UniProtKB/Swiss-Prot annotation:
One of the primary rRNA binding proteins, it binds directly to 16S rRNA central domain where it helps coordinate assembly of the platform of the 30S subunit. This is Small ribosomal subunit protein uS8. It comes from Actinobacillus succinogenes (strain ATCC 55618 / DSM 22257 / CCUG 43843 / 130Z). HAMAP family: Ribosomal_uS8_B. Keywords: Ribonucleoprotein, Ribosomal protein, RNA-binding, rRNA-binding. One of its GO terms (biological process) is translation.
């Protein structure tokens, strides 16, 4: 059976992996998933990202904890296949008053809301992370 929303599945695997105190999680890889994971790693929400090549590439994410607690407090899908959410540069949301990040897919690639605002770009709001 095909997966309807692979990005939501990725976010759920991260959420469940941290709830179970897993060191690392793996999932089927795609360019968008790797780009989202790289943004999360750059922002310090996950430890590392690795793509395991093969007939079906796997994405391995090493989760991050601080004093035994998960670094990611909440991770929430915003734009979904049934209802895409697009925002202009001046409409980009600030997650938790700037403490969290919104992951945005722009014409220049996947980036945080802060980076998109600086670059003067809008795009599809993929998820909120806090």
């Amino acid at each position: 059976m095909s997966m309807q929303d692979p990005i939501a599945d990725m976010l759920t695997r991260i959420r469940n992996g941290q709830a179970a105190n897993k060191v690392a999680i793996s999932m089927p890889s795609s360019k968008l998933k790797v780009a989202i994971a790289n943004v999360l790693a750059a922002e310090g929400y996950i430890e590392s990202v690795k793509v395991l090549e093969g007939a079906k590439p796997e994405l391995e994410i090493t989760l991050k904890y601080f004093q035994g607690k998960p670094v990611v407090e909440s991770i929430q899908r915003v734009s979904r296949p049934g209802l895409r959410i697009y925002k202009r540069k001046d409409e980009l949301p600030k997650v938790m008053g700037g403490l969290g990040v919104a992951v945005v897919s722009t014409s220049k690639g996947v980036m945080t809301d802060r980076a998109a605002r600086q670059a003067g770009l809008g795009g599809e709001i993929i998820c909120y992370v806090a």
